[in-house]
Amino acid sequence: MRSTWLQTFSGKQFIPLAPTVEMICVEDIAHGLGNLCRYSGQCREFYSVGQHSVMASHVITTLDGFLRLSADERRLLQLVALLHDAPEAYIVDVPTMIKQHLPVYKEIESNVMRTIAQKFNIDFALFSHPLVHEADMTMLATEKRDLMGPEPAPWIDMPKPYGGHIFPMEPKKAKQTFLDRFTELGGKA
């Protein structure tokens, strides 16, 4: 018989096709993202989705329009930027050029994201906020500059890279940095 669930780091049973808030745990998200390499592992050295997420939560603070938001809105958008790839902790990442041909995967990913949003009391629509997207794209440009080899063909149009440079973390450090940032932003486990 085929299994319809996976066991998480914390020992929970996670059902990707029917997730519930009880199945979601920030430590599982941090653990999964800390161990998941960006770019299908094709970067020059291991660089986790967890570290990418932490950096996106910082980069968003540098974007035009961020400071015009209220303090509560700024904190919340930083938390959203931190969690924007959280479903990948449970269902891994599928490269964008493939994902666009997998409508069922996109539906599963959306359902997992909705459940994560509900778990952490976040409006699901905020995951589509333009500043969150811009932070993600700024990280893409920065990662391209710092972590990828010479390009064989032009990439998509991207904003300017972030001014700082990326120094990849080991998975355990990425996990702990994610958890620390979650707490710093007022996330409630």
Language-model region placement:
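Metal-dependent phosphohydrolase cores
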Residues: M1-A189
